[in-house]
Amino acid sequence: MNCAFTKELKDEIYQKNYTEHEILQNAYNGKLDILLPVEDASEEAIRSITKIVQDLSFYEFSGSPALLLHPDLYSTFIHTGIATIVSSSDNDNKICISQGILSVTLDKDSYLVSGIDAKPSSSEPKDTLWVANIDLKSAFLRPQWKGFERLKAALGRLPGKWSFYLTFPTEKVDQSYQNNLSHSLPVPMISREINLKKGKLDQAKIPPPLVSTLNRNELFPSNGPLEVLEILSFLRCNAKCVQNSFVPDPYISRYKPSCAVTDVLYLSIKGLFSSSTCLELYELIRNISWNFIGVESFNSFRDVDNSSQLHSGDSSLLSFYDSRTERIRWTWRLS
């Protein structure tokens, strides 16, 4: 678990804070949880968030990975960088596309069969995966050009059964292009609904506000790390960092949190969201008196970073902000 806190500054619109940086590291997100106080600013933010989510398109299709370079899908959605795509297969291989970058993670046999130019993710020979990152926005990758057709053939040689999930902002693509893709793709494109639930939690227990002097010698609030863990529990992550599988209660033994009781607005969204969409939603709530946003990866899917180290397993980003605490924002990364 990584944890950091930053001070929200007036000029922060010009400079990314830690939370924004971490959101941008999660290119493929499947679940967002937002908690807000009951006030007018929260209601307005929820209306804006609902509109943004309703304007997202979310599709599923199954077939060979070569479908990703189908001319209509490639030229309008992938080459322009507006589409976010993640794969699901019956093996350990993974394919994803974000902002026009194709990332492929393959086991050794699939790497050898495909002929894709990839690098090992580790110096350890056992269970090493092979990783490739290809810029599909390149001027040298065009339909019917040699490099394009070579990559398409390599993707077509990948074994297994594949499904792909595609999302993009509807306002960036004319409806005629969406209809054309649905008819021209040789496999069915199934429209998936983004699940959005919102409501009010009556008399919810709220941890005490984070209090910190932000001096060099005190990196925790006045009540110490126990209060931090209590906030983690409230944010529904079940205190993964300390809880053993045989312990049903996420609270630390004999620790009684000093919680207040109040009503809370909640918003829970399930689907597929790019990092830019998550950042857009975060900007709508960041200045409300207190707020929480939780982001979970899509089907335990994480990107491969620039150092070619493979990330796997669940990834969660939790961020809590309270204006009463010297504008401190706590951000947790759970992996």
Swiss-Prot record:
GO terms for biological process: endonucleolytic cleavage in ITS1 to separate SSU-rRNA from 5.8S rRNA and LSU-rRNA from tricistronic rRNA transcript (SSU-rRNA, 5.8S rRNA, LSU-rRNA); tRNA 5'-leader removal; tRNA processing. GO terms for cellular component: cytosol; multimeric ribonuclease P complex; nucleolar ribonuclease P complex; nucleus; ribonuclease MRP complex. Pfam families: Ribonuc_P_40. This is Uncharacterized protein C6C3.09. It comes from Schizosaccharomyces pombe (strain 972 / ATCC 24843) (Fission yeast). The lineage of its organism: Eukaryota, Fungi, Dikarya, Ascomycota, Taphrinomycotina.
